């Protein structure tokens, strides 16, 4: 720094070569010194710049951290605002729906009120009509009161008529009871009649069977009689040889061919039995 302000007069240059050499050395030394000073100045300037940059970097780092924190806060605030916006939107839509439903309900109520207004007019006309009808009925009631006052002396006859009506009602009830009994009896008789028809059909079938058996027995009896009449008369000697055995066989003393007579009697007894059986069944059915 001191070499920069030094001044060398021009007369000293021409003194001698030694002085020139010395001067050149001094100049070179001054130049080197100036270079070192310049380098030192540059280094100092760069150091200051670096220090300033470091300070700026620290400030920027602090500002970056602050901005980052502010950004996080802003993000959280934005999320909260978004949630609030969603809630507000949902609430708004719900309110809109509610308002719409209320509008529909109020419109329906308005229509109902319009209908009620028409019904109210009809009711008013009906009330007026009923008022006129009431007046007419009051007039008729007054007329009826007059007629009842006129008919009051005949109240004894009305009581007798009421008694006769009650008697007639009792007779009608008895007639209805008799009619119900007649219906039940008719149904029971119809049931018994159907049972009787079934029994008669069964008896007719049995009679047909018995008649067939009787015809068969009569045929057999006639065949037995014919066989007995066609048989030869035994000789006296043969009868004597057999003695009482012949009487035992033919029943003795004029009762010849007892088997044929017995068969005929059996047929007659069966016929009478069948007729009695049919009669008894018919009597039981009619009684039942």
From Swiss-Prot:
Gene Ontology CC annotations of this record: cytoplasm; nucleus
Family per similarity comment: Belongs to the FLX family.
Subunit description: Homodimer. Component of the transcription activator complex FRI-C composed of FRI, FRL1, SUF4, FLX and FES1. Interacts with FES1 and (via N-terminus) with FRI (via C-terminus). Interacts with SWC6, TAF14B and RIN1, three components of the SWR1 chromatin-remodeling complex.
Main localization category: cytoplasm
Domain of life per record: Eukaryota
One Gene Ontology biological process: cell differentiation
Chain residue ranges for the region called Disordered: 225-257
Reported consequences of knocking out the gene: Early flowering. Decreased level of H3K4me3 and histone H3 and H4 acetylation in the region spanning the transcription-translation start site of FLC, but not of UFC or DFC.
Matches recorded under PANTHER family: PROTEIN FLC EXPRESSOR, PROTEIN FLX-LIKE 2
Compartments reported by the entry: Cytoplasm; Nucleus
Coiled coil: 38-94, 132-231
Source organism per UniProt: Arabidopsis thaliana (Mouse-ear cress)
Protein purpose: Transactivator required for FRIGIDA-mediated activation of FLC and for the expression of the repressors of flowering AGL27/MAF1 and AGL31/MAF2. Does not alter expression of known activators of FLC expression. Not required for the photoperiod response or for the vernalization response. Not redundant with FLXL4.
Transmembrane segments: none
Tissue expression pattern: Expressed in roots and leaves. Expressed in shoot and root apical meristems and vascular tissues.
Protein name as annotated: Protein FLC EXPRESSOR
Keyword terms, alphabetized: Activator, Coiled coil, Cytoplasm, Developmental protein, Differentiation, Flowering, Nucleus, Transcription, Transcription regulation
């Amino acid at each position: 720094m001191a070499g920069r302000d030094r001044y060398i007069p021009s007369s000293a240059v021409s003194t001698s070569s030694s002085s020139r050499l010395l001067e050149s050395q001094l100049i070179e030394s001054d130049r080197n010194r100036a270079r070192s000073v310049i380098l030192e100045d540059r280094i100092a300037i760069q150091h200051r710049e670096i220090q300033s940059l470091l300070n700026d970097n620290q400030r920027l780092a602090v500002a970056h951290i602050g901005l980052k924190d502010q950004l996080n806060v802003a993000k959280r605030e934005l999320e909260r605002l978004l949630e609030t916006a969603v809630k507000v939107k949902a609430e708004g839509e719900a309110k809109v729906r509610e308002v719409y439903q209320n509008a529909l309900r109020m419109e329906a109520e308005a229509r109902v009120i319009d209908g009620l207004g028409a019904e109210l007019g009809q009711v008013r006309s009906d009330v007026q009509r009923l008022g006129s009808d009431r007046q007419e009925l009051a007039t008729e009631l007054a007329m009826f009161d007059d007629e009842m006052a006129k008919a009051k002396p005949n109240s004894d006859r009305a009581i007798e008529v009421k008694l006769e009506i009650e008697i007639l009602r009792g007779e009608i009830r008895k007639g209805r009871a008799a009619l119900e009994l007649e219906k039940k009896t008719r149904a029971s008789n119809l049931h018994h009649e159907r049972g009787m028809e079934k029994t008669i059909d069964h008896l007719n079938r049995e009679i047909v069977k018995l008649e067939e058996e009787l015809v068969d027995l009569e045929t057999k009896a006639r065949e037995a009689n014919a066989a007995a009449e066609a048989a030869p008369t035994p000789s006296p000697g043969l009868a004597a040889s057999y003695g009482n055995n012949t009487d035992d066989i033919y029943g003795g003393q004029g009762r010849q061919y007892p088997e044929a007579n017995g068969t005929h009697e059996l047929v007659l007894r069966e016929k009478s039995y069948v007729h009695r059986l049919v009669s008894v069944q018919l009597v039981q059915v009619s009684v039942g």
